Amino acid sequence: SSDMHRNRLVHSYPVAPTDTFHIRRVLFEGIDPRDEKWLTQISGLKENSLLTVKKLQEAMSIVIGTNLYSNVSYKLVGERQEDLVLTVQEKSNSAINVGLNFNSEDIVALLLNATFDNRARYHSKFSVTGRIGKRMYGRVDYAIERNPLRNINLSYMFTYHDLDVYNRGDKIVNTTYRHHFVELGYSDMNWLNFKLKLGARYEYFDYNSFLYTAENQKYQVKPEGFISYFAQAHLETLDRRYFPSKGVSLQADYSIYTDNFVTYKGHTFFSALKLSFLSVLPLTSHLSLLPSIDGRVLIGKDPAYPFLNVVGGDMPERYLPQQLPFAGINRMEIFDNSVAIVRLNLRQRIGQRHYISLIANYAIHEDNFFDLLKGESVWGGSIGYAYNSMFGPMNTNFGLSNRNNNLQFYLNLGYSF
């Protein structure tokens, strides 16, 4: 967690990591009594057992890694000092947040968020988020927590989109539409670094205009609603979101789309499988190699326009949830129903906050997954500079690909949202 350096691990007297002592009881101070069971479970601490200092420090790191506590300390008490007491200080999750982002595509965007954490019998959390910019949205989230790592959540989001779609570097269509999104989900993070989420969604796409700039009007689009079911699994050990220095991220998403809970347009539903993998391999103290793989496959007949594969930009999900990043293509382009992307990012850190990145990536896409290796190949790359400021990342890059003829330029100031 990026917050781990702000937490304190405290013990009452100096000891060696290999020292072993007997623990008769494990006690907690400063937490809700209902959380003791799962906290004992994930920490691995057991009563009436032998414990090394190293194992104790690992258990405390796990507690800190939940990101629920601002301070964690321990002490040994009792006549023989056999009672282990862990004292924690819970974080307050009620907050008001403001974000500001400047970039060369959207120009400026403002994000406002208010979160209220209600620590009643059943922990619940309510938040309201709004974004102002070329892409505007309002979102309301409500979650009930069975324990801090398991929750049932209900969300509603309204988005106004003004999207430009490109093909081989040329804009082919501009579309404006309103997107209504409702989600009911269950999240389970009881496994260390692993999150599982299951649920159902309703989405309605209310298209306002669909303006082609080319003669080929390939996509026939009308307002349409979808009922979908999804499962997501995410393994995350990256030490921070931006400029990670170690760890891996592996994410798998599978969604089934219908228009009546069961079928789509009178035939079998269509579905989408998405996989993303990123690893950070330190070569020296300042030089790292970041290999990544992204892929998405649409399965079934007549996949709907709002869920087609789109590629482009320097980060995933920039404009649409299914968007895959590709260095050398700045704008969003529609690809075939099966897409795979391999990327290598060689990143050099200069000093503490400056980074130079050299990225090469290769994509292949084809409508039929079993013919993917016969599909169209796309090559691209970029060179970029970034500064990790206290206000968020500031980065710029220049890119090229065989999908367009022009040098691509992108500038970003601040966290992306």
Kindly give the residue locations of the regions a language model identified.
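C-terminal outer-membrane beta-barrel translocator/porin domains of Gram-negative envelope proteins
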Residues: G65, A95-V98, F226-I350
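Conserved "repeat-terminator" motif of extracellular CCP/Sushi domains
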Residues: S12-T20, V85-S92
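C-terminal hydrophobic structural anchor segments
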Residues: V85-Q89, R347-V378
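N-terminal periplasmic "start-of-domain" segments of outer-membrane beta-barrel proteins
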Residues: R34-N48
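Extracytoplasmic/secreted envelope proteins and their assembly/folding machinery
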Residues: E36, T40, L56-M60, K274
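Post-signal-peptide, soluble extracytosolic/periplasmic N-terminal scaffold domains
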Residues: S1-N7, Y13-P14, Y156-T159
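Secondary-structure transition into beta-strands, especially the periplasmic turns and strand N-termini
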Residues: L192-F194, S285-L287, Q352-H354
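Gram-negative/organellar outer-membrane beta-barrel architecture
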Residues: P33, S49-Y242, V311-P325, M332-A340, ...
